[in-house]
Structure formats: C-alpha cells, structure tokens
C-alpha cells in the first residue's frame, strides 16, 4: 500500500520536533515527557492495546488543573502544523521523474477529449473564454483559526518551500531551520482563541486579505495557464478581457439572522472593498511604471499623452493619479458622507482602457514579450476584480420583508399583508410595481426593524450597480417573496434590474421550486424586470438539516431538473447558485466531482457557488493551492457544459425515490420524533458551549426552540466534535439496507458505476464514515450523558456501524477508503493527536458544566482550544 510520502513525513516530524523544543523551553522536560506519554498511549490504544488505553487515561486523569490548557494547546498546535505540511506537500517542487499534479493537467486533458468528441477548436476557445464562474466568499464563519496565526502559518509554509532545494549550503539550511524554530515559537506563544467575536467588517477584511495575499496572484497565473493550454490545443488565445472566473462575497451583506449586519455596515464594506481595489492596483501600476520605460509607442497612445519621452509612463501616471484620488475619496467617505471627488474612477472601462492601450501599443511596436508580462497580469485582474474587488450580495429572510410590508399596508389602512393569501399579495405587489407614485408618504415613521430593511434597500440604491451581486431571499417559497423585494428596492430608488434571487432551502420549498418559478415567469411585467438571466439559489445546509443528506440531495437534483425545464420552456437563461457548506452534512465535498454530478443542462456555461468559512483558507489561502482549485473549477464547468452526464435511467429515478422516502422516515424518526433526542444532543455534544465560542459575527440560533431553531453550522459542528458525524449519514444506513433486502443490490451497484450523481454521494458518504468514530462518541456519552439517555446513544452508534457495513458491501471493500490509502493513513496518523483532545474535551465539558463563577475561565479556554484542535485535525468544522 502506498504510504504517506517520505518528504511529507519528514516535514511533519521536523515541525513536531520544533514544537517539542518550544514546549520544553517553556514548561521543562518533564511536561514534554507527559505529552509524549499521552501521544504514545493514544497510538497504542488505537492499535488495540489495553495497556496503552490504560496509560492514556491514567496520564490524562493525573493532569493538574493548570496543565489542561497547555496539553490541549500542544495537540492542537501539532495538528495545525501537520495541516501546514500537508498543504505545502500538494504544491511542493516536483522531482524530475515525478508526474505533475492532476489539477495542473486537467484542462489540457479535457480539451483533448472534447476535440476527440467532435468539438471544433474555435468553439472550445469561445466556450472557455465565455464561462461565467462566480465563487461567493462567505464568513458563516467556522474559520476557527485567527488571522494572526494564519499569517504565521503562511510564513512557515514559505520556509518549508525554501528548505526544499537540494543545493542549499549548510549555512543556508541552518538559517532556514532557525527561522522555522522562531515561527513555530511565535505560533505557540500566540493565543489561538479570539477573545471577542469578529464584527461583520472584520470578516469582510479577512475575505479581502485572502484576495490580497493569494487570489490577486493566483488569478492571472491561472488565466496565463488557460491561455497557454488554449494555444496548444486550439491555436487560439484567451481574449484580453475574458473573465471566466469572478469573485463575490456575503461578508458584510448577509444579514439573515445576523442583526450585526446593518445598512451602515454594508455601506462601509462596499467602500472598504473599493479602497482595497484601488490600493492593489496602485501597487501594480507602480511596478508597471518602473518596467515600461520604452520610448516607441503607437499613434493612438501618443495622441493621449502628447510629446513625451516615456509615453507609457506618462499614461500610467494619469491612471495612477486617478487611483490615488479614488483611494483618498473612499478613505474620507468611510468617515462620513462625502460626494465623489473629480477624477474618482466610477466605471471599469476607465481602468481597463489605458492598460489595454499600453498593451496594444507594445504589440504594435514589436514588444509583445513585454506586453504579455506584468501588464497582461494587471489587465486580467482589472477584467476580473474590477474597481470593486468583489460583488457584494445582500441576503435577508423572506419573513423580514413580509413584516415590513405588513407594517406599511397597515399604516396605509389597506389591511395586513401578513394575513393576505398569495393571490391578494400578488395583485397588490404587481399594482404597486407598475404604479408611478411612491408607496410611502414622505413623513412615514417606520419601526426599527422596517427602517433597517428600507435602509438596506437605500444603501443598494446609493451603491454603483457593478459593486453589487444579487439580493438573495432566504426561506423563499412563493412568487410574492421575489416581488416583495423588487417593490422595496423600487420604493428605495433602485432604478436598475438587480438580480432578486429566491433561495429554496427546506424540503417542501425545494419540491415547490419548479411551480413557484413557473408562476413567477408568467406574471405580467416580471420578465421585463429580469437582467438577462433568472438566478435561483439551491440551499444545501438547511435542506440537509430538515430531511437528512440523502433525501435533500435528491430533492436538490429534482428541483434543478425542473428549473432547467421551466426556464427552457420560457426561453429564459437560468443561473443556478449553489449554497454549499464545507462539510458533507451541508452539501460540501470535492467541487470537481460535485459539478460533474449536476443534472444535465443545469450548468450550461454558468456556475455560482458559495465558498465557506475554513474551506476558503484550505482551498484559496496559498496562491499555488488557489491555482489548483481554480483550474478544477474551470475544467469541471467546461466539461459539465459540453459533456454533461446522461439523464438518469427510469429505474435509477424510481430507486432514488424509494431511497429518499426511506431515508426521510429514518432521519426524522430520530431527529424529530424521538422525545429524548434534543436533550441527548445538548448533553452528548458541546453544542451549548459552541454558542459561546467567539467564532463569527452571527448568533448560533435563529430563535428559541429545538433542533429546527439551530443554524446548520453549529448543528454540524457539534456532531463533528464528538466524531459521530450524525447529520452526514443518518438515513443512508436504513435506506440502503432496505434496498439490499429488497434484492436491489445489483441496481445500486449499477447506479454507483454509471451515474455520477450517485457515485459522488457514495464517495462523500464513505469519506465521512472514515472520519466518524463510534468509540470516541461512546467516550462522550460515558462522561456526559445520564444513564437514562445512554440507550439512545447506543442506538445511534449501532446505526453508524450499520452505515459502515452497508457502504463496504456496496463498494466491495473490506476497509473504508481502501482505494485511497494515503487519505486513510492521513486520518489514522491524525487520530494519535485527536484522541487525547477528544478525551480532554469530554473531561473539560463535564467539569465546566459543574463549574460556577470565576473559576470557570481557565476551563472554558482549554475547552475552546480542544474544539479548535478537533476542527484542525478533521480539516473541517461546520
């Protein structure tokens, strides 16, 4: 079996040694010996040694109160260092005989297959250049690591890269070692837990930092790669202003359930993005001005700058001045309302046009090699990021819009909008949308909640349209939900067709998505308010929490099929926006496989998807990693567009209907119908404590109540911490077993081999089952759950074992992930460091629940460190 690469093992070992040296220096050799005893005990216990398990428990039980935090920190920090080594290993320098990573070759290989399938080279070039892929960065934040630490981790990565050269002199190698030791010590002596929750503005700045430090470099590199691959494969170039990849954001725009995101926050974030963009372009222009010292220029460029000895510098100086004016104005506007100064860049063409003029002139004068260097990179950035860096979406719950309209209709003595049926609502909304008079009198004084809804709409009206993405309506279910937002926007002065996007996110709403959109598209005047495409968002997190992942996945698939069919009938272009989380329980999983498993016709050159929380750092935190993931997106969307998977066979559909029905009953039997379930969940997991974790700006709950009141993220996060991973698999075990007992095993095997949708779901299920651990979950029960609730825990662990058996039978393996031994070994290696954290966490939960008063601070800090450590070890949180 292929083991983990020796170079990766060496990096992990070295970082572990450096961490040990740092801990020894602070706490002495005896303390380090204890940590080593714990690690060895965990490793032996994993191999089935009763003596090892005993030693592990005894050492942990013998820890003094003041040792709990440093022990938790040691294992947490090691797992973070292992993540750094693993992430670097994906992009490390290749040896001469090593194959290139799949991600670097995927596009060229795909273009070859597409040509073999009969696609003309010119068509392929046009299709690739015309792709519209938008990655929407969201905070949601399960990002446990602090930004301060992330910067130190990136610096460690840089030193691992510096070390990866065979020709280093002994002195150079020693210097790198010293720098690594210093950085590991800095990370160790930095508090890994935030003391206060980040504000929505902090979250937005974190998103901008990912662009500044990674995507700003990765994007032009990816497009340069696309250009080279296109030239080799088709003989054509990628057009200068092609922008197949774009970025949007919810940070500072997503107010659903987050009272901290106000209209003034949205305005501030829009201005900060504009400031950041101007600042980044200024750095580019300074570099270009230093490079472009040439004298020879085209007549068109000379006509712009007059008689200048250095015409390129003269033109760039003009652009630099306007960028400075723009940056200075946004800085002033952040302090208060300031009218835009003369010279502020308002339109992207004002940024692109001078750069394009320089590029064309250099080519015309025989200096194409210079034109296609840093100048081309800057042009690519200008076409992609524009003047506003990211397009900001706004999201709000449909109930907030309905409440605002109820208040307005009652004030106008028209009755209560809330109490009207759908027909009455639509009649009112259509009449008001077509009316030329304002709905609200000038002296109207709304309540605070309604004032905030209207202020958000006015903030949209005041912002440049190009700085905004879509207005997403969460918990949408009826056509009136969309028209309500259109009316509120119109009333607030939005005179351009902003995309208003219904988000269907419960099982019932997904089932109703097709009929809802059918009705909407036939309403008088609706089509004229569309901005070219009809965008619809599919919710993965809440539908999975509502119905379980199997039933939700099939409902999402069917909803997309129906939406494709309806939009085709109405000759409207459809853009599906996928609200995926980072974890399987929230629709996560490898993006490449997920895109290729979408229903045929649902991608069609367009793809919009959320990139959430900690996954942003893992997928886009380093430029080289970001390049690999952006390559995968381009290839997958192109393939799903030109070589979509076949429609499922009728027998497969019927089977999915049966599976979904059985899974829904099994899932809800536990989560909704068992009267002990909510109490068990709250006691067996750190769910209550997670609410106190200063992760994001958004509260963990929507309102008081049971599981349905929880947000999808803490729901997943809590089960991940105990390794039961319940939301990701519950329902599958019963549905698959029932199918096998009905004699449908061969049909399931056929679906797994021939239908990408089903294959991807089974692969993701297998991965999550490999990370689940019934023994760890049992430890939490033994420490935290009263005797009368423990039978429920045993039943859930039995269901987990059943899920594992069924998946092994379906895949024909004796071990989970037998086909991916490196991944399996990676999980196994991490378990030696995760197990002590789980044991500590269970103990700390027990102590903190008994604790009262000031003495609890130290316990809570240690507990939060174990939470962060488990999240780091499993590479995901919520």
Swiss-Prot record:
PROSITE patterns: PEPCASE_1, PEPCASE_2
Keywords assigned: Carbon dioxide fixation, Lyase, Magnesium
Enzyme Commission number, as recorded: 4.1.1.31
Catalytic activity: oxaloacetate + phosphate = phosphoenolpyruvate + hydrogencarbonate
Cofactor(s), by name: Mg(2+)
GO annotation, biological process: carbon fixation; oxaloacetate metabolic process; tricarboxylic acid cycle
InterPro entries: PEP_COase, PEP_COase_bac/pln-type, PEP_COase_Lys_AS, PEPCASE_His_AS, Pyrv/PenolPyrv_kinase-like_dom
Gene Ontology MF terms in the entry: magnesium ion binding; phosphoenolpyruvate carboxylase activity
GO cellular component: cytosol
Active-site residues, record numbering mapped to chain: 140, 545
Superkingdom in the source lineage: Bacteria
Family: Belongs to the PEPCase type 1 family.
Role noted for this protein: Forms oxaloacetate, a four-carbon dicarboxylic acid source for the tricarboxylic acid cycle.
Name assigned to this protein: Phosphoenolpyruvate carboxylase
Species this protein is from: Pseudomonas aeruginosa (strain ATCC 15692 / DSM 22644 / CIP 104116 / JCM 14847 / LMG 12228 / 1C / PRS 101 / PAO1)
